[in-house]
Amino acid sequence: MSTPRIKAAIIGSGNIGTDLMIKIMRTSRHLEMGAMVGIDPKSDGLARAARLNVPVTHEGIEGLRRLPNYAEIGVVFDATSAKAHLTNNALLQKDGKKVIDLTPAAVGPFTIPAINGDANLEEPNVNMVTCGGQATIPMVYAVKRAVKRLVYGEIVASISSKSAGPGTRANIDEFTETTSKAIEVLGGAERGKAVIILNPAEPPLIMRDTVFTLSQGGDREAIEASILEMAETVKTYVPGYRLKQKVQFEVIGDNAPVRIPGIGTASGLKTTILLEVEGAAHYLPAYAGNLDIMTSAALVTADRWAARRLAKEAA
C-alpha cells in the first residue's frame, strides 16, 4: 500500500521553484508534485516539469486555478516576488490552500526550522524569510540564547550572481528589509541590519555569509558552544551548511563604544561568525547554496505540516 501524500503546487518556475520541485520529487516524505506554475512558456523550469510529467501552466495563478487537479492540491509554494505574492496569497487563501511563502513579502509569520520549527504550522501562510536569513539568523539566535542582552545583529550574505534570477534581483530592497526585521523578531537582536552581495566572479563562488553580533552578559565558551550546536541543527536539513572558520571574539570597551542607529552608543562583546553553504546541486551546481538552504527550509516546514495533517486525517 502506497504512503498517502499531499499534492503540492509551485508558483514560480525560476531557479528556486525548479530546485524545490526536484527536492519534492526526490526527498519529500509526505508531498508529491501537483503542478508547476510560471509566466514564461519558454522557461526551463516549466520544460523540466513537463518532462517529469508534472502538470504545468504558463498563465500564473489564474492558470493554476484552472488546472483540472487544482482541488486536489493542498499546499502551494510561492517562489515569485514580494509584490506578486500579495495577489497570489489573497486568491489561495480564498481557495483554502496552505501557503509557503518563499518571497520577502512576509505576509505570514517568519519561519526558520532551526529556531521556531513547528510554531507556525497551523498558520494559513508562513514566510521563509530570505535565503540570507535562513543561513544567518540561526547564528544570531544562537548568540542570543547564550547572553543576557543582544544589542545588535548584522549579516552579510554573498551569493553567486549566476544563482540570482530575475525574482531575486527584483527583490533586493525587500530582501534587506525582511531579513533585517527577522534578525530582530526571530534572532532576538534589539537592532538588525542585512546586506546582500551578488558576486559576479567566474567560476561562481559558493555562498558565504558573515554574522556580526554585539552582546552583553555572555561567556565566550557558552556563546561558541551555542553556535556549534546550532550549526549541527541546521545541518540536519542542509548538509552543506558549515562554519568556515573558528568563531572570533573582540571586546568593545566603554572607552571606545560603537554607535548603533536607534540605540545609541554601546559596548560589549563582538562576535564574528563566518559561514559557508554548499548546495546539494539538485538544480544549479553546488555553489548555489542560497537556493539549497531556502528550498530545504521550505520543504522541511511543508513536510512537517503535511505529516501533522495526514496524521489527523488517519485518526
From Swiss-Prot:
Its EC number is 1.2.1.10. NAD(+) binds at S13, G14, N15, I16, S163, A164, G165, P166, G167, T168, R169, A170, N171, N290. GO terms for molecular function: acetaldehyde dehydrogenase (acetylating) activity; NAD binding. Transmembrane segments: none annotated. GO terms for biological process: catabolic process. CDD domains: ALDH_C. The active site is at C131 (acyl-thioester intermediate). Signal peptide: none annotated. It catalyses: acetaldehyde + NAD(+) + CoA = acetyl-CoA + NADH + H(+). It comes from the Bacteria. Belongs to the acetaldehyde dehydrogenase family. This is Acetaldehyde dehydrogenase. It comes from Xanthobacter autotrophicus (strain ATCC BAA-1158 / Py2).
